[in-house]
Amino acid sequence: MHQPLTADLNPADEVVAVYDRTGNPIGRAPRSVVYSGGLWHASAGVLVRTGDGSRIYVHRRTDTKAVFGGYHDCLAGGVVDPGETPQETAIREVGEELGIFGTADQPLQLTEIARISWDGEWNNSPLRCHLFAFELRYDGPMAHQPSEIAEGWWWTPKELGAHLQDPSWPFVPDSRALLADYCWS
């Protein structure tokens, strides 16, 4: 497979890592090309739970998001940038979206909880993504990124599980697939 071209990029179009079907990084391309061409890429997200694990942070994406706008999610995350690992992406995204940052003395302690390759669809186009989920136990403050998150709240695993059982509930489908086998207790 050839490496996607990066010439003549629109400077406003974010460049993301492109992967092959088996999960190996093979190049880079503008996000718009990845989405319009159904190219494989990778995404990483963080499931934030209270320190005791009794609550999970759930949020609603802003209506202006390019993909799954207005849908609910329990992962703060995004696409993997060229040269970035999924864990680095997860750390970057939980900082950007929820204002949760580690320090040199106390880096964020993420635990990988799931990974899948999702060959889905959005707006009648293929959407192919290698998905990585990490868990973070956290009891501190949060600050939503206004362009990404409209609102958020803490739910028990039972509350979230009940909502996920309802296929009509507008929940990000790739996160739903990624966490299908996750133990919510």
Swiss-Prot record:
UniProt keyword NAD present: no
Molecular functions (GO terms): hydrolase activity, acting on acid anhydrides; metal ion binding
Cofactor: Mg(2+)
Protein origin, superkingdom: Bacteria
Record: residues binding Mg(2+): 93, 97
E.C. numbers: 3.6.-.-
Protein name per the record: Uncharacterized Nudix hydrolase orf19
